[in-house]
């Protein structure tokens, strides 16, 4: 976002404020939907690098909106935060020792911004680009790191999951949580 603001003449960078508005507008939309009688549910994940960037830019408009989405008890049943990597690194190309470091860096920054209680509510993990390691050893270490860091579930693309016999999931199975075995 900062690069977009500083270089408005390049590509779509003139849209920097539209991006900033998107980062903060859910703090307006979710309460409005609740006031209208709806029961919205959304899952959000922002990389640690993005959160840090908002701080470095002094974007209190965005930070205040995120603070509300994370910490307002009235919004907590409607907004589920997911952990992710500190940077936007994709798991298949991240060195194995760095997987856990990426996870821990995000957790530490999220807790520093929003408090330990907010971090304790984060149960799911969203890997950048929903990429999972193809190599079984890397996938094992990735899942191991997630479990060691307290995550209970992982957001994946439905075609990434199959039945134990190798058959694809039925439509009904794809819409429900699945146990990793």
Q: Model features per residue range: what roles?
A:
Residues 131-181:
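Active-site-adjacent pocket scaffolds in enzyme catalytic domains
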Residues 29-39, 57-82, 107-118, 146-147:
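Acidic (Asp/Glu)-rich catalytic clusters
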């Amino acid at each position: 976002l900062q690069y977009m603001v500083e270089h408005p003449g390049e590509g779509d960078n003139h849209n920097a404020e539209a991006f900033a508005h998107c980062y903060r507008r859910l703090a307006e939309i979710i309460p409005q939907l609740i006031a209208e009688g709806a029961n919205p549910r959304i899952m959000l994940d922002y990389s640690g690098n993005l959160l840090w960037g908002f701080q470095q830019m002094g974007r209190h408009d965005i930070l205040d909106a995120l603070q509300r989405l994370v910490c307002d008890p009235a919004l907590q049943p409607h907004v589920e935060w997911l952990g992710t990597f500190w940077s936007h690194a994709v798991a298949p190309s991240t060195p194995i020792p760095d997987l856990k470091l990426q996870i821990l860096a995000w957790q530490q920054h999220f807790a520093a911004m929003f408090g330990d209680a907010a971090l304790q509510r984060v149960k799911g993990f969203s890997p950048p680009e929903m990429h999972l390691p193809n190599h079984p050893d890397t996938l094992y270490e990735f899942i191991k790191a997630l479990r060691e860091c307290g995550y209970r579930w992982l957001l994946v693309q439905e075609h990434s999951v199959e039945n134990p016999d190798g058959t694809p999931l039925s439509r009904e199975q794809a819409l429900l949580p699945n146990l990793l075995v």
